[in-house]
Amino acid sequence: MKIRPLHDRVIVKRKEVESKSAGGIVLTGSAAGKSTRGEVVAVGHGRILENGDVKPLDVKVGDTVIFNDGYGVKAEKIDNEEVLIMSESDILAIVEA
């Protein structure tokens, strides 16, 4: 996949995570809801500050992240794969192993 986000944008591929109901039943597909975890597949050069400096992003390609899946997150199909385009500010956390 060839895509290069601009500025503070990040491209994330959603990861499927196993969900369980309160009763311990494993939920899959639409019953589980959409995952808010994903893998960063591309990052922009950074956020342009008011003084013209560029602040590099904290996330990097390969990071697993938890993100806010709401307004401002755009889903796109690229090479038959769905990816999410978001600002770094839509990312809530980096999952460290």
UniProtKB/Swiss-Prot annotation:
It holds the Pfam family Cpn10. The keyword Cytoplasm applies. It is found in: Cytoplasm. PROSITE patterns: CHAPERONINS_CPN10. It comes from the Bacteria. GO terms for biological process: chaperone cofactor-dependent protein refolding. One of its GO terms (cellular component) is cytoplasm. One of its GO terms (molecular function) is unfolded protein binding. InterPro entries: Chaperonin_GroES, Chaperonin_GroES_sf, Chaprnonin_Cpn10_CS, GroES-like_sf. Keywords: Chaperone, Cytoplasm. Heptamer of 7 subunits arranged in a ring. Interacts with the chaperonin GroEL. Belongs to the GroES chaperonin family. Together with the chaperonin GroEL, plays an essential role in assisting protein folding. The GroEL-GroES system forms a nano-cage that allows encapsulation of the non-native substrate proteins and provides a physical environment optimized to promote and accelerate protein folding. GroES binds to the apical surface of the GroEL ring, thereby capping the opening of the GroEL channel. This is Co-chaperonin GroES. It comes from Edwardsiella ictaluri (strain 93-146).
